[in-house]
Amino acid sequence: MAGIVPPVADERTALLAFLAQQRYVLRLTAYGLTDSQAVAAPAASELSVGGLIKHMACGERSWMDTVLERPSGSTDEYDRGFELGPDETLASVLDLYERVAAETEAIVAGIDDLGQAVPVPQGVPWFPDDVKAWSVRWVLLHLIEETARHAGHADIVRETIDGATAFPLMAAAENWPATEWMQPWQAPAVAR
C-alpha cells in the first residue's frame, strides 16, 4: 500500500480507503516487533503498540455493533482493550484487526445510504446528550479520526522502543530498495 490514499471515485470508496490507510499505518508500527516489544510501554503512558492495535480492533467492532444496533462488549472488555491478555500475541491481535476490517467493509458495503441514522448510545459520559443519532458517514469519519490518533500514539511508542519511524518501516515491509534518502528499517543486531 502506498504512503497516501490513491484517487477515489465516490464518497463510500473514499471513506473506506482513508480508514484502510490509517489501519495500515497503525499496523506498520508493529512491523518487526517481538511479542515482548509489542506489549512494552516505554513512555510515561501505559500505551503499547499491541494494546493500541487491540483497542482499535475492539473499538471499530463496537462502532459497527452500534451501526447495526446489536449488543456490544462490556465496560470490562473496553477497559482491558488496551492490554494483551495472557493468551494473546501480536500476531493474534493483528489477525483480529484484519478480521474486523473485513467485517467493517462488508457492513458498509451492505448499507445503501451513508446518511442512515445510527442511534447515539445513552449513558456514555463522553457522548453528547443533545444528539439522538449520528450517521454511518459520521461513524466512518470518527473511525478515521480515532485510528489516526492512535496510529500517532503508536508511532511515538514504536520510536521509543527502537528508533523506528513510519517510512523506514513501510520501506522494509514493502521491500522498497534503499536510496540515499530512505533506508528501509532493519532489526537491530542482537549482542551475543
Segments the model singles out, each with a brief description of its role:
Residues A2-V5, R12-Y31, D35-G81, P121-R192:
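Short, contiguous alpha-helical
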Residues S72, V108-A117:
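Proline-centered turn/helix-capping motifs that create local helix->coil transitions or kinks
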Residues V25-L28, G32, R99, E103-G110:
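Solvent-exposed, charged/polar functional surfaces in cytosolic regulatory/catalytic domains
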Residues G73-I107:
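Helix-adjacent hinge/juxtasegments
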